[in-house]
């Protein structure tokens, strides 16, 4: 691997269980698909001590993103932490397979956002998914969601999603995780995590908006990317999915700049 490849790898997050002296511990979870149980883990520091001090980011101290390695079975959840640093939540794998689990956090000790990841296996009869086609539109729970924008490796891309229902724009999007929508972007294949941030000011409690929500992001390499949009209407969270292709040359990371991190 040459120096440019090394720098690029360092700038892409969500590929390691350890970053900046913090380690995502072994994840315990139900061993079989469709089995009820608990998913639990700790995050430890360089001395092996579980960390208990985290800053809230996008309204939560930890964002847990879970997706099967073929890009299906996406979930974005928020476990609770006990006094000893053990994060947990009730859990059931809905399908057998290999899953990537991402913990998105801001340790108080550094004040820097990091993304740690591990792979977890759920045993059972595996049903492979057909690769999703390129798509900038999705329909979920009766809502039509369209995405406008092009991913690029050479500049920040503006991605605007628009939500409608029965042909009418939805103007009652509620605040969710500090914005009117939350977008996760993963590089197909290794499932590297992109930094994505919403545009505009944080909404006031009780405010509503719509039908458009805009995000900014930049792809590290050309290729296909899997995008997952969470939005909330009438206290219900819905998830739309898209597949985009990024164009342009691979980035050469500047070692003098801070590495990018995942959005939440």
Placement of each model-derived feature along the sequence:
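Intrinsically disordered, low-complexity terminal tails/loops enriched in metal-binding residues
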Residues: 1-264
